[in-house]
């Protein structure tokens, strides 16, 4: 059995925030043939299809380990895969590893404290950007990031589905990607705004010319 955990915070106020990208990927992996396993002892939303378990802990990020431990103790899966955001990776980057340090991620810290760190991790970059780390992870994706998020989640979904049937090293070779630096995203957004402004200016000039021609015709 394989337990796949997507980390995030419960509640509408945290929906679609950067810290919840693990939840988003679990939603992508869910299909109609998964059955919901409702039990308060798991402290999360748990779904099962054959030998695959999908978990979205509902404990809030800092206590994610409580939910993971409860499911791990009950089902005793052979493998655990944890999907989470990573501030230190460029937006859209994908990295795969087993064990290692938490990198300051409180959800990973919580899991490590309760079951150890001998599990596989899918790290999805959200980019550090500027400002306080806590504010960044709890912020929503901007318009430019939102446009790219569909493709990022689609690739990450394929990676997890591949990882289920293959080892972490092969998955890393096939699906690791660098992502985009925040300044590139900012430039793309600026370019789009500039193009939009140029288009609006051209339309304005065109309308002025039409108006001038119309006035000239009336005078004649």
From Swiss-Prot:
The record marks 85 as: Stabilizes the basic form of H active site to accept a proton. Its main location: cytoplasm. Monomer. GO terms for molecular function: peptidyl-tRNA hydrolase activity; tRNA binding. The active site is at residue 19. Its EC number is 3.1.1.29. It catalyses: an N-acyl-L-alpha-aminoacyl-tRNA + H2O = an N-acyl-L-amino acid + a tRNA + H(+). GO terms for biological process: protein quality control for misfolded or incompletely synthesized proteins; rescue of stalled ribosome. PANTHER family: PEPTIDYL-TRNA HYDROLASE. Belongs to the PTH family. Hydrolyzes ribosome-free peptidyl-tRNAs (with 1 or more amino acids incorporated), which drop off the ribosome during protein synthesis, or as a result of ribosome stalling. The lineage of its organism: Bacteria, Pseudomonadati, Campylobacterota, Epsilonproteobacteria, Campylobacterales. HAMAP family: Pept_tRNA_hydro_bact. The keyword Magnesium does not apply. The record marks 9 as: Discriminates between blocked and unblocked aminoacyl-tRNA. It is found in: Cytoplasm. TRNA binds at residues 14, 60, 62, 106. The gene is pth. This is Peptidyl-tRNA hydrolase. GO terms for cellular component: cytoplasm. Keywords: Cytoplasm, Hydrolase, RNA-binding, tRNA-binding. CDD domains: PTH.
